[in-house]
Amino acid sequence: MSQSGATVSQDCITAFNDLKLNKKYKFIVYKLSDDYKEIVIDKASESRDWEDFRETLVNATAKSRTGAVGKGPRYAVYDFEYNLASGDGIRNKITFIAWSPDDAGIQPKMIYASSKEALKRSLTGIATELQANDTDDIEYDSILKTVSKGLAA
């Protein structure tokens, strides 16, 4: 259980293991349920299109406890695959991204921040973690550079 009291749905863990072990998904986006009591899957996709993933985050919404809908935070895992510049082959790194746009509501941002560790603890095998607060933070090239530690071709 997280500091916010939210629990992680078993579906979240099952889907993550399908991404990690079976390569069933390229990415998974997680969200808090509307009542903020459980972390659930927002979208699990086989799409290798970075823009599809990026748009899922950018277009995410959240409802405040008063019912107002605005931009929303999300958690995501993305299975990065890249070639090493040295020619030594292909590498995969599962990356956890905490998306909390600057213009999201204060309340959703606080609840997401206090629930993040519970999800991360449930997902064994994350290689890299990133915090993203605006669209520049989720540009493919900049994330790939971080994930690969500058070793990608």
Swiss-Prot record:
InterPro entries assigned to the protein according to its UniProt record, in alphabetical order: ADF-H (IPR002108), ADF-H/Gelsolin-like_dom_sf (IPR029006), ADF/Cofilin (IPR017904)
Function as written in the Swiss-Prot or TrEMBL entry: Controls reversibly actin polymerization and depolymerization in a pH-sensitive manner. It has the ability to bind G- and F-actin in a 1:1 ratio of cofilin to actin. Binding to F-actin is regulated by tropomyosin. It is the major component of intranuclear and cytoplasmic actin rods. Required for accumulation of actin at the cell division site via depolymerizing actin at the cell ends. In association with myosin II has a role in the assembly of the contractile ring via severing actin filaments. Involved in the maintenance of the contractile ring once formed.
Subcellular location: Cytoplasm; Cytoplasm, Cytoskeleton; Nucleus matrix
Gene designation per UniProt: COF1
Gene3D superfamilies associated with the record: Severin
Pfam families assigned: Cofilin_ADF
Keyword Hydrolase in record: no
UniProt record similarity statement: Belongs to the actin-binding proteins ADF family.
GO biological process, one term: cell division
Keywords assigned: Actin-binding, Cell cycle, Cell division, Cytoplasm, Cytoskeleton, Nucleus
Presence of keyword Ion transport: no
One GO CC annotation: actin cytoskeleton
Name the UniProt record assigns to this protein: Cofilin
A GO term for molecular function: actin binding
Major localisation: cytoplasm
